[in-house]
Structure formats: C-alpha cells, structure tokens
Amino acid sequence: MGDRIGRKPVFMITIALMGLATVCVGFLPTYAQVGIWAPILLVSLRLLQGLSAGGEIGGSAVYLTEHAGNEYRGFKTSFLQLMGPLGILFSTLQIAVLRNYLSPEEFEAWGWRVPFWISLVLLIIAVKARMALEETPVFLQLSKSSQKTERPLLSNFRDPQTRKRMFLLFFCISAGGAVLFFCVQVYTSIFLKTSVKLPPAVVDQLSIYSTLALFPLTLFAGWLSDKVGRKPIVISGLLLGAIFIQPAFQMLQTLGTQYLGAPNINNPLIFLELVLTGLSVSLALVVGPQTALLAELFAAKTRNSAATLPHNLAAGWIGGLLPLIVTWINQEWGSDFAGLWYPTIFLATGAIVAFMYLPETRNNSLLD
C-alpha cells in the first residue's frame, strides 16, 4: 500500500490499528466473565497488533529515511531504532511502579490493565502528531512523474537484483537484528531470573541500565555508518554477537552466582552490567544503520513493499521462533547454554553472507 497510495496514509492506518488493539486489551473481559471468548479476543487483538506493527516498522523506516536527506542519513534514522528499547524501558518502569504500590492481588485483579489504559493517551498524541506530517518528497516526485507501480510486490519478485537484496535484508540485516534483540533485550532477563535465580528486582534494575546504554550506542553506530559505510558496521555487529554470546551468558551465570553468595557486595553487579552492555554493543552495531539500509537497498517505486516484506518475515519467522528453538535445544541437551549455539551459528553465517554479497549503500540516491 505504501508504494501505491503513499507513505503517510499507511503510517496513519498502522498506528491507529495498533493503538486501538492495545487499548482494547486493557478492557478485555476475564475468563470468568465470558469463558473461552476471553483468550480468543486476546489472541485476535494480539494478531491485529502484529499485523499493524508489521506495516509500521518497514513503513516508518522508509518514511523517515526519505525525509532524512543525504547528509548524516544513518545517524538521523538511527533514532527510530530506539523506539523498541524505549518501549521496553517504559513498560518495565510501569510494572515496577505498579508492583511497588499495589498488592499482588490488586495487580493480578486490575493493575496489569493500567499500562494498556495509558496507551490511549499515547495513541491520541501519536495520531495528532502524524496528521501534521507531510508526504515524503520521494513519493511526491514519483506521483508527479507517473513512476508509481500498480503491482510493486510482483515487480520486486520479477527483478533478480531486488530479489537478491530482499534475501540479504531478510537473512543478514533484519534476522540478525531480531536474533540479537532477543538475546540482548529478552533472553538475558529470562536467563538471569530462571537459570541464575537472581531476584526479579535486581534483574529489572540491570535491564534498565543496559537499555539506557543501548541508546547512545545505537546513535553512535548510525553516525559511524555515515563515516565508514553501512556494510562494515553491520558485519562487525553480527561477528561480535557470534563471538560474544556464549561466553557472555557463561559470565552472567558465574557473576550472578557470586552475587547470590554475597548479595551485599556490589562488584558482581557492576561486572554483570558491563557484560550486558557488551552485548548491547553488538545489537547497536546491527540496528544503528538498519533503518537507512532498509530504504537504501531498493528502488523508490517499490521501496516500501521490498523493505517491509522481508523485514517482517525475519521478525516473525526468525525472531518469533527463536525463543521456542532455544528452549527446545536447552531441554534436549539438558543445558542452559546449548540453545545459544543456534543464534551464534546464525549470526556467524549472516556475517559471512553479508561480507560476500551485501552491497554498500551509504552513497545511494533515494530518488533512483
């Protein structure tokens, strides 16, 4: 749709659907009230959130990049990558505050709904802000020159170069980012709580600090990609993740065990945070240039569909299934670390493929 009717209309549709679905979760009836319809409604709303988020991520990347111009494009567009960690940070803070002021019974009864109610305010602000946005200059030029494609997705699959770049985006950039996001932002907390048995409050504190560290690291990676190119930065992040994941989680277990043995000593916590920050570096190197790369890889007339499809497939197939695969391997091998070989091998393979085939796009014109 973004290649046919414009970047801005799709931008408006996705935020409206996502916001309404999120707000509705906060008003869902319980199983005791409506029975089986409660989980059915929840799954339906989650699917709607997923579908709208799919259009949002690729569409916002194209929209922002086409407005960014040619100078410091990587740095300007890297701000978009902060939104995911920022959401995790605010949700963690909300839950921490609610748990602090509410009893466990109150939180289970209605407290969990509060973040979903608050999202109504965010939805109103987002819709008003986006109504003031302008269509991208690239799409306006396409419309004036009658270069728009009626079947952009079909055109993408017919063009050999576009097909190749869609695969590279899927396998190396988007899947690599999804794998690292899971390992750095999601699995570290699960691992520290379930395997190491650290107190949830301590884990939440560590997660907040590591997420805060991710913000400047991501912006720096985007800026650095403007200086040395997107390709070397992305490959560095993939390689660093492949090398560092296994030893990092082993260090997390060792340091966490030391902390449990002497909880009044802060040194293990400081080193735990350093390990988490090291993992954040690998994630930042991949996602920092990612927004610009999504748009720069493809021609303007089919850019939105060419960037959105592989990016969403990578998030769903690779990122979405990663927790299941890691957990299954851990159970089969009876180890807390065995499953981590899957993301390690995936990242190493992605780095090799990117080194061999990923083109440098830093100086590409977005009007072509």
Describe the function of each predicted region:
Residues R4-I15, K227-L238:
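Cytoplasmic membrane-interface "Motif A"-like loop-to-helix N-cap segments
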Residues A16-G35, L239-N264:
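C-terminal ends and interior cores of transmembrane alpha-helices
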Residues V34-G54, L260-L285:
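Hydrophobic core of transmembrane alpha-helices in multi-pass small-molecule transporters
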Residues F75-R99, L122, P310-L322:
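Glycine-rich segments within core transmembrane alpha-helices of 12-TM secondary carriers
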Residues G84-R130:
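Helix-loop-helix hairpin linking two adjacent transmembrane segments in secondary transporters
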Residues M131-P152, N364-D368:
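Flexible cytoplasmic inter-helical loops of multi-pass small-molecule transporters
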Residues T162-L214, I318-P323:
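Extracytoplasmic gate region of multi-pass secondary transporters
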Residues K301-W333:
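A late C-terminal transmembrane helix in Major Facilitator Superfamily
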